[in-house]
Amino acid sequence: MNIHPTAIIEDGAQLGADCVVHAHAVITRYVRLGDGTVVHPGAVIGGDPQDLKFDPATPSHVRIGAGTVLREHVTVNRSTIAGGVTVVGANCFLMAGTHVAHDCAVGDQVVLANNVLLAGHVSVGAYTFVGGGAAFHQFTRVGESAMVGGLARITLDIPPFVMAAERDEIVGLNLVGLKRRGFSGEVVAELKECFREVFFDGGNVRHRAQEMLARSVQSAEVRGFLEFFAGGRRGIARARRVWSAENEVGSAAL
């Protein structure tokens, strides 16, 4: 373990093996860091939530997964709920200035670029990449292996495996991300067809997804994509219909 002498680590904080805490970082007593976590200068982990109703006496926590890197001036606030936990998964990379508000749940292998802002109760699925300066409304959900462009304004849910940009616009499947995760050609083809049917065959997207689930769904990935539509409280972002002759799934960017 390597702790800079100017770092502040409160009694009660739990640090795993081989953690590194750089100058002037603050780790409050409500925090548990997994093995190999690196906290860079000026980061504040486990601070009180920015909620005017919050009682500072509430016992709540932050949990950071093993191998995660928190760059300069990252803030991760503890939960507003007694016994609640704000979670950042394992092997994540949160770049400088990122804010993770109370009660968020960030999955494993997530990258949040500089100055990404997650409001309270936002969930981000594993293997998702978010570009710099993107901001997320409270209670929004982002599915696994999604990609959200820089400076995006997200107020609605973003399903798994898609790319999103601007103001709640889905612009196609995240084909590069799927390839990097080793998805087979058969699964990618099935996801393309599923994407097209849900977003471009007319009707309510939640109803379309439910109808498709009632059929024989071949892959766990497609089932996960469709099941995502049944949850949440913010509504689902809409897809931009810009056809591409190359991929035929609705985005010239793919």
What residue spans do the PLM features occupy?
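Terminal amphipathic alpha-helical/low-complexity segments used for targeting or macromolecular assembly
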Residues: M1, P5-T6, G36, G42, ...
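Structural signal for interior beta-strand "rungs" in well-ordered beta-sheet cores
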Residues: N2-A165, E169
